[in-house]
Amino acid sequence: FAIVISGFYKVFQLFSLDVFGIEATSFAIIDINQWPMWSQLLVFFVLSDFVQWFTHVLLHRFDVLWRFHKVHHSVKEMGFAAHLRYHWMENVLYKPLKLLAVMLLGGFEPEQAFIVHFAAISIGHLNHANIKLSYGPLKYVFNNPVMHLYHHAYSLPKEKSYGVNFGIS
């Protein structure tokens, strides 16, 4: 993901600056580059999670998109590798939305993208690991392996959650 962001910005800078005289940073609604690094990473993580949640809702709600996402839900037994089982078209949906969100917040450095991506992948593996681990009272706030088992159940409750890292979503 870090390479994608870095490459996207370079191509965008070359194209937009040469053709239109526009810099990538001019799309930013706010510029968080001057914020402390920990707060930039936190914003990036929450923003990425929101984009994934939004895309995940679309994948479940629309039949044409569900046809792609059902590959992920077709796993017979949960395990950490289930996190990486998905149709390639899901990336086509996720990545542009995530890149747009990053541009609107003034962009992030590739190193930050790597840190957030690594954290998200680690959490995703944990949530798909088929272990009985909840976070006590925080289980109502953060997605966890037990909650995610319900999400992958064959018969879902009416009020199913689409959350990726946060249970409240």
Where are each of the predicted segments found?
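Membrane-embedded catalytic scaffold of the fatty acid hydroxylase/desaturase
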Residues: 2-169
